[in-house]
């Protein structure tokens, strides 16, 4: 995949030193786009049904579960480090309907997704997101 312009990559070192919450900020959107795109491509459902299915995968509990699976199965040491940095970041607030542990793990996964996207590691991002989508039957 080749992406240029505003959506194009930045230097890997620049991506690596970004605040993990900044990586999670962009990673949240990229994760959401992957899930929604997969659902649209595989389904003829109406928007409400698509949104319901997406919400089963795009939430802190599911993302925390995905982070644990990825960490155990396929992440490199560098990717585990980025996930850890995201998990250990202090966001200031946590949504009321989830555990702090799930929220932190989800933030770690979002940071990893953001890092891979910003640094232009699109093939690796695709591998990781394919595994996540497989886990949740998307």
What positions do the PLM features span?
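Double-stranded RNA-binding/processing signature
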Residues: 1-138
């Amino acid at each position: 995949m080749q992406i240029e312009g505003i959506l194009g990559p930045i230097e890997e070192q620049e991506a690596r030193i970004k605040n993990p919450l900044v990586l999670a900020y962009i990673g949240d959107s990229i994760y959401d786009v992957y899930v929604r795109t997969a659902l649209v491509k595989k389904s003829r459902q109406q928007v409400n049904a698509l949104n319901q299915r997406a919400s089963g995968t795009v939430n802190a509990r599911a993302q925390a579960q995905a982070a644990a699976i990825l960490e155990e199965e396929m992440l490199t040491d560098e990717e585990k480090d980025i996930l850890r940095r995201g998990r250990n970041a202090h966001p200031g607030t946590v949504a009321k309907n989830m555990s702090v542990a799930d929220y932190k793990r989800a933030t770690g996964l979002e940071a990893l997704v953001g890092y891979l996207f910003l640094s232009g590691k699109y093939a690796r991002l695709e591998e990781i997101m394919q595994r996540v989508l497989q886990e949740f039957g998307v």
